[in-house]
A protein has these predicted regions:
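Short beta-to-alpha transition helix within the HATPase_c
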Residues: 1-15, 70
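Conserved short strand/loop->alpha-helix "switch" segment adjacent to the catalytic nucleotide/phosphoryl-transfer site
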Residues: 16-49, 53-65
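Short beta-strand/loop element within the Bergerat-fold HATPase_c
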Residues: 62-75
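Glycine-rich/acidic phosphate-handling loop/turn and adjacent ATP-lid/helix
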Residues: 74-103
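Glycine-rich nucleotide-binding loop
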Residues: 87, 122-128
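A short, conserved alpha-helix near the extreme C-terminus of the histidine kinase catalytic
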Residues: 103-111
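Glycine-rich ATP-binding loops of the HATPase_c
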Residues: 112-120
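C-terminal end segment of the histidine kinase catalytic
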Residues: 129-141
Length: 141
């Protein structure tokens, strides 16, 4: 997944990050997922990273985005996407938001990945996704 995350994040930065100096820090880790998990995982990452470039740096013109994927144990996958941008506006409950992108991301995490998505708002925004790795089918790096 490392190569895909790297390509995706750099592509989204070129599309949405013009006029801003956003540093991408990707923590490499060899994580293999089945295709049935790699596809929804890629869709979720696309939405989260797009949202960062569209919304996290409205007030700031520079910042940092950190993306990591790891396996804290042999069957658990942990993905973290963190920015030091403006943060989620006070009083905004992202769980009740009706925006299609974030709603889709939550559905893919809970429905297809059978995982959890947690959001922290502290000096920017950090989203953590955790799910159990499946053993079905061919693995995608």
């Amino acid at each position: 997944m490392d190569g895909h995350i790297r390509e995706l994040s750099h592509h989204l930065q070129s599309v949405y990050g013009s006029g801003k100096k956003i540093d991408l820090i990707l923590t490499p880790s060899k994580v293999y997922l089945s295709v049935s998990q790699a596809i929804p995982c890629a869709l979720v990452l696309n939405e989260l990273i797009s949202n960062i470039f569209k919304h996290a740096f409205r007030e700031k013109k520079q910042g940092t985005v950190r993306i990591s994927i790891s396996t804290p144990d042999p069957i658990t996958v942990l993905i973290k996407v963190k920015d030091d941008g403006d943060g989620i506006p006070e009083g905004l409950d992202i769980h009740s938001q009706t925006g299609l992108g974030l709603k889709m991301a939550r559905y893919l995490v809970s429905g297809q990945l059978k995982g959890e998505m947690c959001v922290k708002n502290d000096s920017g925004t950090e989203i953590s996704i955790q799910f159990k790795r499946s053993n079905d089918g061919k693995k995608y790096e």
